[in-house]
């Protein structure tokens, strides 16, 4: 299904034939905005039913006003939201009555952070089989949602899916060496911690993520 959907996307790019009846891929500018809104609304519904809820997003920018408003709504409903946004973020986290359940972290290190990851609890505890996990080419910006061709791809391979949930996201959460926390004032504060954990070093040295395993000889910064 994913390969067939991808073929339709490339046909769209080369011959302007609109994709029809896509099975797995969600693409911009056709449906990604509505899809993201629906995914956030689903987490709101789970929270209101006292079921596990949560959103984890890794991207380069969060700018779209309507999506930001929907994330505020989710926060007020009790959805815990972790945003790893390397660049510009127009959302204000940790504002009482608005975004108390939202944490925004910028990790500035060796990697340029072009990978985008979208994880939704989907009524299950974090790292459970219920979680919806996607990789994407798109940031949460108007140009990515409304004017460019972008894709959101569900992770069906259990190995890769597990790596995202049990290694990549936890490493981003625990990173202190290269992390800056966005405050409600719009200022970034450098995180300080005795452990000084570096997610980028972890990605390069972890056997299942780097391809090098224990063969890595050099200490990364």
Where are these regions (language model features)?
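Prokaryote-biased recognition of long, low-complexity C-terminal linker/tail segments
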Residues: 5-14
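PLD/PLD-like phosphodiesterase catalytic module centered on the HKD motif
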Residues: 1-3, 16-22, 28-221
């Amino acid at each position: 299904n994913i390969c067939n959907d991808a073929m339709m996307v490339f046909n769209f790019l080369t011959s302007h034939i609109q994709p029809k009846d896509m099975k797995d891929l969600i693409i911009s500018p056709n449906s990604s905005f509505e899809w993201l809104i629906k995914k956030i609304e689903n987490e709101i519904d789970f929270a209101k039913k006292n079921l596990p809820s949560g959103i984890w997003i890794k991207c380069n920018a969060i700018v779209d006003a309507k999506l930001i408003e929907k994330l505020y709504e989710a926060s007020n409903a009790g959805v815990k939201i972790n945003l790893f946004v390397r660049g510009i973020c127009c959302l204000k986290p940790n504002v009482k009555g608005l975004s108390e359940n939202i944490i925004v972290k910028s990790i500035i290190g060796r990697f340029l952070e072009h990978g985008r990851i979208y994880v939704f609890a989907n009524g299950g505890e974090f790292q459970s089989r219920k979680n919806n996990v996607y990789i994407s080419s798109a940031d949460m910006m108007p140009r990515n949602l409304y004017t460019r061709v972008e894709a959101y791809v569900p992770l069906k391979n259990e190995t890769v899916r597990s790596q995202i949930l049990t290694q990549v996201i936890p490493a981003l959460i625990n990173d202190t060496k290269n992390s800056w926390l966005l405050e409600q004032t719009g200022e970034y504060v450098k995180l300080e911690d005795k452990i000084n954990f570096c997610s980028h070093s972890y990605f390069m040295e972890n056997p299942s993520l780097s391809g090098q395993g224990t063969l890595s000889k050099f200490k990364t910064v």
